[in-house]
Each structure stands twice: as C-alpha cells, then as structure tokens.
A protein has these predicted regions:
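N-terminal topogenic module of multi-pass integral membrane proteins
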Residues: 1-74, 78
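Structural signature of hydrophobic alpha-helical transmembrane segments
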Residues: 37-48, 97-104, 154-160
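Structural signal for the C-terminal ends of transmembrane alpha-helices
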Residues: 56-63, 115-120, 169-177, 196
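Extracytoplasmic soluble-region selector
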Residues: 137, 190-272
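Membrane-interfacial entry segments at the cytosolic side of transmembrane helices
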Residues: 174-187
Length: 272
C-alpha cells in the first residue's frame, strides 16, 4: 500500500495514464455484451476516476502541481473517451452531449485537488478531507447493492470495488489507528444511511375506475402485474427493462403505461 504514495508523478506518466484510461473506458463502452454490467460503470459513474485522481495528487510534491496535473489528466481522458467512440456510434459527435457533466467535473478538479491534497498532512484535517470521498464511495456501494439485488450478478464487481477502494484509501492514506477507526466509521454510516435513502420502490399501484379490467403486458419478464379487487393494479419489479402495459375496461376504456424497472425500482409513465 505504501507504494501507492511513493510514485514519481511525471507529466509523461500523467498523459500516458489519461490515454490508457480513456482507451480502456471507450472499448468497454463499445462492447454490447458489457451493457448494464460493472465493466461499463467506469464510463458512467465517478468511483474509478476518484482512484485515478487520488493516485495522481498524492504523488505530487506541491498543491499547485496536484491541481494542474489532475486537471490535465481529466482534460485529456474524458473527451478522448467520446472521441474514440464517435466512428462506431450512430450518434457520431452527438455523443459529446454527455460530456457536459465531465467537463464540469474537470473544471472542479482544480479546486478539488487543492483540497484533496491536504490528505497528505496525516492529521485530522486529512481524515475530514478523505471522509468526503469515503462517504461518496459508501453511497455508491449502497446504490450498487440495490442494483445487484434487482439484477444479480450485474454490478456486483462495482459494489465490491467501492467497498474495497474505500478501505484501501483508509489504510494507504491514513497512519494513526484513531484516524482509521473514524474513517471506517464514516464508511459504515454512509452505507447504512444510503441503503435507507436509496431503498428502491419495488412495487407501484395504478388506480383505475370501477368495473372489470383486463390487461396485456408487452414483456412480462420486466414486471409482474396483479389486478386487485379494489379496482387497482399492482406493478412489481422483476428485472431491469422497459415494457408497455395496456389496460382495457369492460366498457372499452383503454389506458396505456410505460413500465420501467431500473435499480430495482418501478417507474410508471402514462401514455396520453
């Protein structure tokens, strides 16, 4: 673990790391059999990029160097990810509409790296600064937990990665037992709170008018449908996906809904 903070962070290493990360991310994003799996999470969510950022800044000797090199890493890697995908995507350069988030994140690395650099102090300020990243990783771990539960084993690697990365940061960047104990507490609390806040809505109810209703569902594997005696319909998550639910009353009234299951939650949209 000590080797993690003992590297010489040259400009050559920053640029090569940015290019390698971009190529790997783009390739994983382009392969269709990785859809909705941990292997594409690197292209969507920030946890892997937190690792890259921390690796760069803790191996810099000054806060100014940390800020500039972290900024340049993201300035190269993020647009390159989309540029590599352009020739293989129907959207072409339209893919860059998704770069807006990462452009904002890239700009924020300048002040962010200055603050994060304080983790090298090895004191309670280090614990406070690191706790922000640990709390975020705990939040992401909870999010992936519900995704795994909804479509096991998809995202299981991402769940394990977030927990292990948080623990790695604790033992690689903090030295005192009291600091580590507090940091581990932050991880556990953030996971527990996030599990409660992010708990999916496994079932939704559609209220109908009186009378007898029948239904058809385009893809029954996505959601389970139950007609209740109180003139309502219960929709329960089965697996990730989208399907069309059509309800018809005995008088001929017709109602249509898009049913989306994502992260274990059920979302219902009315079709006018």
């Amino acid at each position: 673990m000590k080797e993690f903070t003992k590297q010489k962070m040259s400009w050559k290493k920053v640029i090569l790391l940015a290019a390698a990360a971009a190529v790997l991310t783009a390739v994983l994003k382009l392969l269709p059999f990785f859809n909705n799996t941990s292997f594409q999470d690197i292209a969507i969510n920030p946890e892997c990029w937190i690792l890259f950022a921390v690796f760069i800044l803790v191996n810099c000797t000054r806060w100014q160097e940390a800020a500039i090199k972290t900024f340049v890493f993201f300035l190269i890697s993020q647009p390159l990810i989309y540029l590599i995908q352009v020739p293989f995507s129907k959207m072409g350069f339209g893919l860059f509409q998704y770069y807006k988030f990462w452009f904002a994140a890239t700009v924020l690395t300048l002040p962010g790296a200055v603050i994060a650099y304080q983790v090298k102090r090895k004191d309670w300020l280090s614990v406070a600064v690191l706790s922000v990243a640990l709390a975020f990783l705990g939040y992401m771990a909870a999010s992936y937990f519900w995704s795994v539960r909804a479509s096991f084993p998809n995202h299981l690697l991402s769940l394990c990665f977030c927990i292990l990365l948080a623990l790695f940061f604790v033992f690689a960047l903090l030295e005192h037992k009291s600091h580590r104990a507090v940091a581990i507490g932050v991880i556990l609390i953030s996971i527990a709170v996030s599990l409660i806040l992010l708990k999916p809505t496994f079932s939704q109810t559609i209220h109908l008018g009186e009378g007898n209703w029948t239904y058809t569902v385009e893809d029954p594997s996505v959601a389970g449908i139950v007609l209740n005696q109180d003139h309502s319909v219960s929709v329960t998550a089965n697996q990730k996906g989208t399907t069309l639910l059509t309800l018809v009353s005995e008088s001929g009234e017709k109602k249509e809904f898009y049913i989306t299951v994502s992260g274990g939650s059920v979302y219902i949209s009315t079709i006018d």
